[in-house]
């Protein structure tokens, strides 16, 4: 009964009345023009959420409209909800060939990500359209799904291994997994030898995060941590991804950095000669080369935000 089925306009008394859609759009346009004339184009912001990235027309139109008014206040679910992803990549670098896709992989680790409900996951996790069906289909082909989350989510109910860790301890878990992977030689040694710097320094940094120590902070057993590390490290294809929650928790950037680290040391990238998904159908092709792209700063350039003075 409360579903909005027609265009409404709020009256001064706070109630709503119906209005012709074209008239509503005209009135909105007039008000936006007045705001831009009085305060400048930056006063108008655009926010594109996760669903906007799954709607090619909406994403393109929103960008074009925003550019037409000359505003720099363009925000997305990455810049607002998950800034750790861009910030970690800005100091880590990237593999131009891209990481493994979900389809065809034999493992996927979901850290604080519940795509069954959110219909969202970073690339490498279950695609947003019918994620449960995609998870079920890949598991039938042998994929192992690891879920790490303080809550037993819907995705956890469909996983092969679930670790119900304490909130805010994602970096502890990931450090322990990397420690086990390196200690047991489960990393991609050839890939690391050619493309990874400071591997020995990484080994030293994660050494204190033994399964026993991590378990005392995570609230799970050491055996579960080792099982997760071996399940991920022994796989051939598949990546770890994080959702919104880990980025909003303490040390969110570190969490994303460690996820990039885990995927990298395990060599979960598209290498020379491998097939890549969607080489370019609705958008121009992006060159996919088997090489490293140096880290590029994510800040200290472009217009400054007003929120910090």
Give, region by region, the residue ranges found by the protein language model:
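A glycine-rich, hydrophobic/aromatic-adjacent loop/helix-cap motif
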Residues: 232-309
């Amino acid at each position: 009964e409360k579903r909005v089925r027609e265009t409404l306009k709020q009256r001064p008394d706070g109630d709503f009345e119906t209005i012709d859609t074209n008239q509503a759009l005209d009135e909105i346009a007039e008000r936006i023009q007045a705001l831009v004339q009085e305060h400048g184009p930056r006063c108008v912001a655009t926010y594109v959420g996760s669903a906007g990235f799954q709607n090619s027309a909406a994403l393109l139109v929103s960008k074009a409209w925003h550019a037409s008014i000359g505003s720099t206040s363009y925000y997305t679910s990455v810049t607002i909800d998950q800034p750790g992803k861009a910030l970690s990549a800005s100091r880590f670098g990237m593999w131009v060939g891209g990481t493994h896709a979900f389809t065809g992989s034999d493992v996927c680790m979901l850290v604080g990500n519940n795509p069954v409900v959110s219909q969202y996951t970073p690339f490498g996790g279950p695609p947003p359209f019918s994620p449960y069906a995609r998870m079920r289909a890949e598991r039938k082909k042998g994929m192992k799904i690891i879920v790490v989350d303080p809550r037993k989510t819907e995705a956890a109910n469909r996983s092969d291994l679930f670790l119900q860790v304490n909130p805010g301890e994602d970096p502890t878990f990931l450090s322990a997994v990397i420690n086990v992977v390196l200690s047991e030689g489960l990393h991609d040694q050839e890939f690391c030898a050619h493309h990874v710097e400071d591997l020995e320094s990484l080994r030293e940094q994660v050494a204190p995060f033994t399964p026993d120590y991590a378990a005392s902070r995570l609230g799970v057993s050491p055996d579960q941590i080792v099982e997760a590390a071996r399940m991920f490290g022994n796989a051939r294809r598949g990546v770890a991804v994080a959702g919104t929650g880990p980025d909003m928790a303490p040390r969110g950037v570190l969490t994303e950095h460690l996820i990039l680290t885990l995927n990298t040391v395990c060599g979960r990238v598209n290498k020379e000669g491998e097939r890549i998904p969607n080489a370019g159908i609705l958008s121009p092709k992006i060159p996919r080369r088997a090489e490293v792209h140096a880290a590029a700063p994510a800040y200290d350039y472009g217009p400054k935000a007003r929120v910090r003075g």
